Amino acid sequence: GSGHIKLDGCVIGLRPGEENKRRLSTQADGVHCLNTSGHIWIENCDFSFMGDDGTNIHDNVGLLTSNVDSKTVVCQSNLLCEVGDTIEFLENSYAPTGVTAVITGKIAAGSDSIRLTFDKELPDSIQEGCILKNTKYDSSYYYIANNYYHENRARGILAQASQGLITGNKFFRTQGAAILVITDIAQGLWSEGTGVDTLTVSSNTFE
């Protein structure tokens, strides 16, 4: 995935002169970074009137829904992966299992699932409810500073990756939480976040 991304002084807002006609700047997130190689810098920006979150940083994961045989599982298709990728298996609590395996086969399994075959037999502990993480992606290491998030639907910042610093931002009239730290799996809809570790939130203003 892309990495070393910098946004400095960007504005997402209502079109000047059209404020009384159109009250929506975007219908989705202002900035949505997923399945990247991390190192994301967002500073001195103004994000407002989005139809969803101001900033969302995460990697997609897969939810194991069934075991076919000792080397094959079915999971939600939100997991972006290809043959040759290394998958790390996590407990449903996101605790590590110590198990990794390389994908040797991938086919669709219905409209919202994929069937994955691996290069080795999986231990009996890898069962329904486990989380699949593609080690190729890691959106960690992000700096979000001195931005103004205001008057948007949903959250200001949705932080779902590790090694982040969120500092000096101002939040005004966000419909949801100004800063939400979460991992979120809605079966059949989305599966975002690999667990957040080492996140600092400091010197922000909430109104």
Residue ranges and their predicted role:
Residues G1, I5-K6, R15-D29, G38, ...:
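Short glycine/acidic-rich loop motifs that flank beta-strands on beta-rich extracellular proteins
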Residues G62-V68, V99-A108, F118:
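A structural signal for short, hydrophobic beta-strand segments that form beta-sheets
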Residues D69-C75, A108-D124:
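A generic structural motif
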Residues S2-K6, G38-W41, S140-Y143, A161-I166, ...:
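Short "repeat-start/strand-capping" segments in structured domains, especially the N-termini
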Residues S77-D112:
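Ser/Thr/Gly-rich low-complexity blocks that favor extended beta-strand/coil architectures
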Residues R22-C33, I57-G62, S70-K71, I126-N134, ...:
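Extracellular beta-strand/beta-solenoid scaffold signature
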